[in-house]
UniProtKB/Swiss-Prot annotation:
Gene3D superfamilies per the UniProt record, alphabetical: Tetratricopeptide repeat domain
Swiss-Prot/TrEMBL GO biological process terms: chloroplast RNA processing; mRNA processing; RNA modification
Residue stretches of each PPR repeat: 98-132, 133-167, 168-202, 203-229, 230-264, 265-299, 300-330, 331-365, 366-396, 403-433, 434-468, 469-499, 505-535
Protein name, UniProt field: Pentatricopeptide repeat-containing protein At1g08070, chloroplastic
Pfam annotation, one family: PPR_2
Sections of the chain in a coiled coil: none
Note: The DYW motif is dispensable for editing activity in vivo.
GO molecular function: RNA binding; zinc ion binding
Region span, Type DYW motif: 647-741
Entry's Gene Ontology cellular component terms: chloroplast
Knocked-out gene: effects: No visible phenotype under normal growth conditions.
Entries under NCBIfam families matching the protein: PPR
Disulfide feature: none
Length: 741
């Protein structure tokens, strides 16, 4: 809003007042020490406040400005309830409020969620002929800063100059902060330069402005000029470095601070511990932790939360859990930090269990909680819990700052849990779609083999003027890769590099090389590797190894495996892939040698693990698993499945199982793969016709793929399986991947 008046000459206000008879205040001491006012100190409810106010009216204190100012001040500062509306109602009854009362009201409005109301009140006051003073301007300027009311702030600056308040340090600092928060750093610096009395507070206000906008050198220059630095100025500079990603510089500055006589406070330690977490400086973090304990900060909740985050991010979850468990009181940030730590370390099941414990504790989750837990639901395929979170978000978290990110996370969760239609519904419900939302939906369709839908979205994006980024093109190339669309993949790669002038990243090359390898174009794939500006990673070499197995190219497979082992010597997957290539070619001696080499190095193949969610509980199975409470029923269903599969003509392909095993044992090894155990459990745990969704940590093998196609037809079930790379939708004996994966 604009102050629709010239400075200090405002039209009469329509602000509604209900006047009480005026009277002069009785002697000051008799009011200040009155028992009724002392009751405010113990007031914790709005009902109690009304009773105290009624008593004040009964004994005549309602006509004294001092008593009313204390009542209004209590209302606006009460930590127990929202008292501003009551303060406004009291204010409207005062016939001639003095400047103290006006300033108290400005303070309340400035602290509220509607700071513009302070500006409206300011217009009202000067229209009544009252002049603001140096106590008025800091609150009104704070409102201009919070509401980004730059024009109004300029006008009030004029009032400051006219009334000669510009020399007041508080007003001076408030002007700097107002300009800073409105992004007017040049104006802020002009105010700073004109001040004959620069104190550490005004320096700090300007330092924060420069640092928050990335002008860290300007901030450092000002910081160096401060003659006597206090803890606030040190904090401003340290947090300035941290917030701009200069964590090492932040920590070096903290070390400099420790050489002075300035004692760090809560804000310092939270910033420093967070900088250690972000930079992975665990050793320095431990030293800081010792200092915290030695100097009496060990029970500070904010600092302990920061320490939990430090140890979580640095992989020391046992220490993080210990800190969490020892907290006498845990706030929502405590819970969020540890849940986020579990998610960060890929301990998704532990994250879900902690989330459920949080709900049982009575703590109310917020948007940050949901952004931490939705990836866990997505990874585990825990769609029932994901749906509950969706309902919670719709009911409790509408309009939060992270609303767009929450919707994008829901799209990702539904897509990764197998319900691509639900993901699409969430996408369509977003009125103002961010690029992240478009990308999440493109990726969702891609992983479900819906390349056509991915490209339809891309066309819609371009029509409405949304520019794709490098992530968009990873999604599109991934869609081509999952569907074997080589020509379209080449076209998209050219579009990205030529039309959008984007430099390909490792992920883009990975998709193209996977496409070329699947198509048997190994020479072209190697040429692309040679033209890359970066070294290929393990994902690229793995995709080529799988392609060699598919096309029976043992010689190239050996070469690619050698490259993979060089960059990932401790990865057993490279030996397993090479062993599979030898097995496909019937070279059993090489299979035995490769497996022996794997054993000699003490490495073990990552076991296949599949999970299925039943009634909001995620059940996990490994190959040959016999530890489930319903183990007997599961294996009974497995036997039934095998009988029906055999009747349907299914014959297991045992060519890739070690030669030394008897044929009967080979078939048994295939029969007990983790995805089959999960399917068997799903069949005995759900009603006929219920859709089953399986999540597997490895690529589904050819035998299980063929068997699952038939199982979907025999039991008349839709079975959705997510393996390491994509989704398979099995229905009526057919898979959505068309046997291309």
């Amino acid at each position: 809003m604009m102050l629709s008046c010239s400075p200090l000459t405002v039209p009469s206000s329509s602000y509604p007042f209900h006047f009480l008879p005026s009277s002069s205040d009785p002697p000051y001491d008799s009011i200040r020490n009155h028992p009724s006012l002392s009751l405010l100190h113990n007031c914790k409810t709005l009902q109690s406040l009304r009773i105290i106010h009624a008593q004040m009216i009964k004994i005549g204190l309602h006509n004294t400005n001092y008593a009313l100012s204390k009542l209004i001040e209590f209302c606006i500062l009460s930590p127990h309830f929202e008292g501003l509306p009551y303060a406004i109602s009291v204010f409207k009854t005062i016939q001639e409020p003095n400047l103290l009362i006006w300033n108290t009201m400005f303070r309340g409005h400035a602290l509220s969620s509607d700071p513009v109301s302070a500006l409206k009140l300011y217009v009202c006051m000067i229209s009544l002929g009252l002049l603001p003073n140096s106590y008025t301007f800091p609150f009104v300027l704070k409102s201009c800063a919070k509401s980004k009311a730059f024009k109004e702030g300029q006008q009030i600056h004029g009032h400051v100059l006219k009334l000669g308040c510009d020399l007041d340090l508080y007003v001076h600092t408030s002007l700097i902060s107002m300009y800073v928060q409105n992004g007017r750093l040049e104006d802020a610096h002009k105010v700073f330069d004109k001040s004959p009395h620069r104190d550490v507070v005004s320096y700090t206000a300007l330092i924060k402005g420069y640092a928050s906008r990335g002008y860290i050198e300007n901030a450092q220059k000002l910081f160096d000029e401060i003659p006597v630095k206090d803890v606030v100025s040190w904090n401003a500079m340290i947090s300035g470095y941290a917030e701009t990603g200069n964590y090492k510089e932040a920590l070096e500055l903290f070390k400099d601070m420790m050489k002075t006589n300035v004692r760090p406070d809560e804000s310092t330690m939270v910033t420093v511990v967070s900088a250690c977490a972000q930079s992975g400086s665990i050793e320095l973090g431990r030293q800081v932790h010792l200092w915290i304990d030695d100097h009496g900060f060990g029970s500070n909740l904010k600092i302990v939360n920061a320490l939990i985050d430090l140890y979580s991010k640095c992989g020391e979850l046992e220490t993080a859990c210990g800190l969490f468990e020892r907290l006498p009181y845990k706030d929502v940030i405590s819970w969020n930090t540890l849940i986020g730590g579990y998610t960060h370390m890929n301990l998704y099941k532990e994250a879900l269990l902690l989330f459920q414990e949080m709900l049982r504790s009575g703590e109310t989750p917020n948007d940050v909680t949901m952004l931490s837990i939705l990836p866990a639901c997505a990874h585990l395929g825990a769609i029932d819990i994901g749906r509950w979170i969706h309902v919670y978000i719709d009911k409790r978290l509408k309009g939060v700052t992270n609303a767009s990110s929450l919707r994008t996370s829901l799209i990702d969760m539904y897509a990764k849990c197998g319900d691509i239609e639900a993901a699409h519904q969430v996408f369509n419900s977003i009125l103002h779609k961010s690029l992240s939302s478009w990308n999440a939906m493109i990726f969702g369709f891609a992983m479900h083999g819906r390349a056509d839908a991915s490209f339809d979205l891309f066309s819609r994006m371009r029509k409405i003027g949304i520019q794709p980024d490098d992530i968009t093109f990873v999604g599109l190339l991934s869609a081509c890769s999952h569907s074997g669309m080589l020509d379209l993949g080449r076209h998209i790669f050219r579009t990205m590099t030529q039309d959008y002038k984007m430099t390909p990243k490792l992920e883009h090359y990975g998709c193209m090389i996977d496409l070329l390898g699947h198509s048997g174009l190994f020479k072209e794939a190697e040429e692309m590797i040679n033209m890359m500006e970066m070294e290929p990673d393990g994902v690229i070499w793995c995709s080529l190894l799988k392609a060699c197995k598919m096309h029976g190219n043992v010689e190239l497979g050996e070469s690619f495996a050698e490259n993979l082992i060089k960059i990932e010597p401790e990865n057993p997957g490279s030996y397993v892939l090479l062993s599979n290539i030898y097995a496909s070619a019937g070279r059993w001696n090489e299979v035995a040698k490769t497996r022996a080499l794997l054993n000699d190095k003490g490495m073990k193949k990552v076991p296949g693990c599949s999970s299925i969610e039943i009634d909001s509980v995620v059940h996990e199975f490994i190959i040959g698993d016999k530890f489930h409470p319903r183990n007997r029923e599961i294996y009974g269903m497995l036997e039934e499945m095998e009988v029906l599969l055999e009747k349907a003509g299914f014959v297991p392909d045992t060519s890739e199982v070690l030669q030394e095993m008897e044929e009967e044992w080979k078939e048994g090894a295939l029969r007990h793969h983790s995805e089959k155990l999960a399917i068997a459990f799903g069949l005995i745990s759900t009603k006929p016709g219920t859709k089953l969704t399986i999540v597997k940590n490895l690529r589904v093998c050819r035998n299980c793929h063929e068997a699952t196609k038939l199982i979907s037809k025999i039991y008349k079930r839709e079975i959705i399986a997510r393996d390491r790379t994509r989704f398979h939708h099995f229905r009526d004996g057919v898979c959505s991947c068309n046997d291309y994966w």
